[in-house]
Amino acid sequence: MAWGTVEAEPEVDNWLGALSDREFGHVAFYIDLLEAEGAKLRGKLTRPLQGDVYELRFHMGTEDHRISYWIASGRRIILLTHFRKTRMNERREVRRAIRAYEKCVAERHNAEDD
């Protein structure tokens, strides 16, 4: 039984739609794990970014990837942004994820509204 439900903001939805079937299956494994475990998912797969925003961490090929998310009311896991992890872009991407979260909260928006 799932801990919650996963909803994707347009950025993540578009990125997922552009993946090959093989890549999508790989990423779906981690998203499904997040859906099954929710806030209980810990260890190397998740990390808090700031406040209520976390990142789902996974490898695809030789690259590290991240999907930022937050847990909204009703155990809804909202996927906010996607990025490839590099040392050079981490601070910028964390700020971008925080802005996406703040926009969601300010607009009382959730992915179901799209």
Where would I find each of the regions flagged by the language model?
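Basic, Lys/Arg-enriched alpha-helical interface segments
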Residues: M1-D64, S73-I77, F83-D114
